[in-house]
Amino acid sequence: MIRYIFIFFLTLIAISSVECNAQIASPNKVVSHKPVIITGADQTEKYLPYLKGKRIGLVANQSSIIGTVSSVDSLSSLGINIVKVFGPEHGFRGNASNGAVVNNETDAKTGIPIISLYGKNQKPTKEQLADIDLIVFDIQDVGCRYYTNINTLEYVMEACAENGKQLLILDRPNPNAYVVDGPVMTDDKFKSAIGIHYTPMTHGMTIGEFAQYLNGEGYLKNPCKIKIIKVANYNHDMPYVLPVNPSPNLNTQQAVMLFPSLCMFEGTAINEGRGTYTPFTILGAPALKGKYAFSYKPVSIPGMSERPNHKDSVCYGLDLSTYAIDRLVKSRQISLSWLIELYNAYPDKANFFTPGRADQDISAFDLRIGTDQLRKQIIAGVSEADIRKSWEPGLQKFKAIRMKYLLYP
């Protein structure tokens, strides 16, 4: 209890310090006392009593922090009995490359078993949950259908429902919550490891809201019993700079904000910066030599991208590392212009979109987008305005559904 009170007062002191520093920096200006966003995890007073005396399973990675300290370390130091940690794609420490199989291990620092949900099984098994009373989910998401943390959330909820376990969600802001955009996946044939939900490409929900959506829209055979610790002082239009990189290739705020637009290129002949230390801020391909002055060379980077597209070849294209993100925020849209531009500039258009399921005429791009319509529209030269118009019926229907599950304005 003493340690809990100590941490609580440290949090108050930190918040006061931020406000005090603002006053010192601008002594002659009117200081705006905007409420400070406080994540669910940082509101320990709201959930510590609920964890006491229970055997806890924690779904976590490097973004799971209380203050600046790992949630595993913090909760353990506060006397919480964490018996198991479940890690998503990229692993518990967040140092595995995209798509890489992650094995079970024991955390060297705490001795706690770490179960990979991106290895032999994506869903916790009955045996893995047998010695757990409560599951806690605390992972930062970035608001895209093709970012696999929401897949992990569904699998964990399904396992909890099947095994009579409750799920406590420590909610975090969605840095891309301002945008609900892109085509809505409506056909099962486009389901894959990077998309299993009938949402637009960007859904505009936090993890807590998405959990309510999964329960309410019948994604689970039986609803999961959930308890959500909401983010304090937050709404969907508020900017949020992530305190920790959510995955190895989202290593800057610029990359996080560009991710919804640039991740589309993973299903094309264009390299989106993987194999560099500025992923998701640059675009290019060797075939664009002579059409763009900007160039870079993707290489193998352990823990980020071992086999990037166009490895060891000079790529030419676009440098978006200084692109004004405010333009995307104000438009409340993902960008289509870069996709259209680079397709039109690419000399070998027949090989711009990379293969996926050839027997079904589904490209890797289609699996990421959730439909084959966009690919066919790009090839046919349909204008951006008409492409966006074709998305509207699905978007309007989804937005009406989404409204039922929002926890924040």
What do the predicted segments below correspond to?
Residues 103-131, 144:
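Glycine-rich oxoanion-binding loops at beta->alpha junctions
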Residues 190-262:
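Conserved anion/nucleotide-ligand pocket segment
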Residues 232-316:
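Glycine-rich, aromatic-lined ligand/substrate-binding cores of catalytic
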Residues 1-32:
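Bacterial Sec-dependent N-terminal signal peptides
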